[in-house]
Amino acid sequence: MTNIRKTHPLMKIINHSLIDLPAPSNISAWWNFGSLLGLCLGIQIITGLFLAMHYTSDTLTAFSSVTHICRDVNYGWIIRYMHANGASMFFICLFLHVGRGIYYGSYTYSETWNIGILLLFAVMATAFMGYVLPWGQMSFWGATVITNLLSAIPYIGTDLVQWIWGGFSVDKATLTRFFAFHFILPFIIAALVMVHLLFLHETGSNNPTGIISDADKIPFHPYYTIKDALGFLLLISLLLTLVLFSPDLLGDPDNYTPANPLNTPPHIKPEWYFLFAYAILRSIPNKLGGVLALVLSIAILAVLPLLHTSKQRSMMFRPISQTLFWILVADLFTLTWIGGQPVEHPFIIIGQLASFLYFFLILILMPTSSLIENKLLKW
């Protein structure tokens, strides 16, 4: 009799995705982040669901409902901090996952890559709206500043902002709709993840060499299931260490002050994972220009397949491109640092130079270096 996992309609899907899936024999730990992102999404949905049971999306009670969760609900504090720090873990895994894709040329699977970009935008939108919900000072002013950027859109900008706010300022209507969107988006993300995997399994995974590995495949289970399990263990250990020892390490102390529309915090800044984009936004003196640069800082990923000029897929055997890649990583760290600094000399000029370098590296230097490396192959 044939094994049920190969015949049952539902089991068959799971089998082809997790058990009998042919996987390259040489994929490194950099390929672990896909499954880790799945784990992060699962943690966020479960902890978020339990938080939603006790949270109230009203301007008068939102802040105190979060306090109530931490003080009065059984293990509410750990659920709340796992959710808050889980978001940081999510973004760490996301950035490493995207970085892996750039380094090893995974973006040549254009459908998988483009859905990945959509996922990145969706996760960023979800995280932004989630940050507004505790209704602290940084929640309120972050929401005000970021939504107000849409007013830079010509002609319809102001109307659009007021439509999103549900009034003439960030208020009760805004908080309620942000809660609704924050609740529904993770499920849309989960659906997009399925599409992301569907397209990935059409082609199979890339590998560090960037060479087609059809002749050398191994079953996903037990090799990569055990490898993923180790990754899960490490991620959960790291998350719990953060939650139990320094839960507020990555947060902003201003968010422990209830939202006050009459008192602006001295430095309005988003969570750490948005600081690089925030630095790019602030580096352009023009409002519309800044908004365009902000969107392009992520959307630029979509043009990577078009800018791939190398004869090799991966950067594994391309030292010049490798150097530029690591300069790009250092540049992103610089932007993240600048995003958290006040708008004053010398931070302004550093931010402008780092923003210029970011686009210059991706659009000009990296494609040019690939062409040079193609020439070097003939030596």
Swiss-Prot record:
SUPFAM superfamilies referenced in this protein's UniProt entry, alphabetically: a domain/subunit of cytochrome bc1 complex (Ubiquinol-cytochrome c reductase) (SSF81648), Transmembrane di-heme cytochromes (SSF81342)
Transmembrane portions of the chain: 33-53, 77-98, 113-133, 178-198, 226-246, 288-308, 320-340, 347-367
GO CC entries: mitochondrial inner membrane; respiratory chain complex III
Amino acids binding heme b b562: 83, 182
GO molecular function, one term: ubiquinol-cytochrome-c reductase activity
Residues reported in the UniProt entry to bind heme b b566: 97, 196
UniProt membrane topology term: Multi-pass membrane protein
Cofactor requirement: heme b
Co-factor binding details: Binds 2 heme b groups non-covalently.
Keyword Lipid metabolism: no
InterPro entries: Cyt_b/b6_C, Cyt_b/b6_C_sf, Cyt_b/b6_N, Cytb/b6-like_sf, Cytochrome_b, Cytochrome_b_C_euk/bac, Cytochrome_b_N_euk/bac, Di-haem_cyt_TM
Subcellular location: Mitochondrion inner membrane
Domain of life assignment: Eukaryota
UniProt keywords, alphabetically: Electron transport, Heme, Iron, Membrane, Metal-binding, Mitochondrion, Mitochondrion inner membrane, Respiratory chain, Transmembrane, Transmembrane helix, Transport, Ubiquinone
A single BP term in Gene Ontology: mitochondrial electron transport, ubiquinol to cytochrome c
Residues reported to bind a ubiquinone: 201
Quaternary structure and partners: The cytochrome bc1 complex contains 11 subunits: 3 respiratory subunits (MT-CYB, CYC1 and UQCRFS1), 2 core proteins (UQCRC1 and UQCRC2) and 6 low-molecular weight proteins (UQCRH/QCR6, UQCRB/QCR7, UQCRQ/QCR8, UQCR10/QCR9, UQCR11/QCR10 and a cleavage product of UQCRFS1). This cytochrome bc1 complex then forms a dimer.
Other noteworthy facts: Heme 1 (or BL or b562) is low-potential and absorbs at about 562 nm, and heme 2 (or BH or b566) is high-potential and absorbs at about 566 nm.
PANTHER family assigned to the protein according to its UniProt record, in alphabetical order: CYTOCHROME B (PTHR19271:SF16)
Family of the protein in this entry: Belongs to the cytochrome b family.
Described purpose of this protein according to its UniProt entry: Component of the ubiquinol-cytochrome c reductase complex (complex III or cytochrome b-c1 complex) that is part of the mitochondrial respiratory chain. The b-c1 complex mediates electron transfer from ubiquinol to cytochrome c. Contributes to the generation of a proton gradient across the mitochondrial membrane that is then used for ATP synthesis.
Annotated protein name in UniProt: Cytochrome b
